[in-house]
Amino acid sequence: MITVSNVSLTFGGQKLFSGADLKFMPGNCYGVIGANGAGKSTFLRILSGELEPTTGTVTIPAGQRLSTLKQDQFKYDAYPVLDTVIMGNQRLYDIMKEKDELYAKPDFSDADGERAAELEGEFAEMDGWNAESDAATLLTGLGLPVEMHTMLMGDLKGGEKFKVLLAQALFGNPDILLLDEPTNNLDNRSVAWLEDFLMNFPGTLIVVSHDRWFLNNICTHIVDIDFNQVKLYVGNYDFWYESSKMMQSLMNDQKKRREDKIKELQAFIQRFSSNKSKAKQATSRRKLLDQLTIEQMPASSRRYPWVCFTPEREAGKDRKSVV
């Protein structure tokens, strides 16, 4: 679970969003959408604790493990692929390495034996014996062939590294999973496998993606970053699209009615303010006019493609005929 309270962010003098109050619950998948530059990836960095918000707080219950899709494809170049995936649960990986170092000591002492026993107990509780097979299953599902599982990360291509880092994020049943564009570099089969995995994920899942089909298949909620606000909608991408259009239409209608009312009052005041018999009514309407305000709607950060072809001349009315 993640609780976001009054979070705002100003970046480079520009306000990306403000007053965000959200609660992300286990068992739900939240798709984060918005225009390029709206702050989707930045919002994920705030949730993960990598970036401090300008105002507000992000709260995660103690003991919950958070996993993110790493973006640095060169960080693990010196490590084998399987080890890189297992690093998704850093505590488990540290236990495995410390065990190996202890058992490799030529002067293995009683103290070393006691420490090894402690590590073995924790290792078993974390299902460590299945770590390599679990990592291999993730890699295979994402389309990385078995022969690459023992290679060094530095020997892989960019798309192959991405699959390893995605497997790393998925590894070890985290309580909270944050994924930024997870379908990049995946073919259709791997995307289908990932959808199935995420639909069965029991924790709190938050995904940034431009793939509306992917979001439709996995999301229970949509988080829309637009108009310098972060709003939560129940439902998948299509439901958000219809709901947001309806909400925008209602806001436009409300603004139009208020504008029409102001024009009506202004016309009455202008017409009858000098008429003694209508003076009280004009004064009453002036007070009402002073109470009416038109809230300026912030501009949307979305830009939709638009193409217009202007003809050089008007089209003829008669079709060409041959006699």
Predicted feature locations:
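ABC ATP-binding cassette signature C-motif
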Residues: 1-255, 309-323
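Short hinge/gating elements
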Residues: 121, 270-272, 305-307
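Intracellular alpha-helical coupling/juxtamembrane segments of multi-pass membrane proteins
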Residues: 243-268, 272-296
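Short, flexible cytosolic linker that couples an ABC transmembrane/permease module to its adjacent nucleotide-binding
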Residues: 298-314
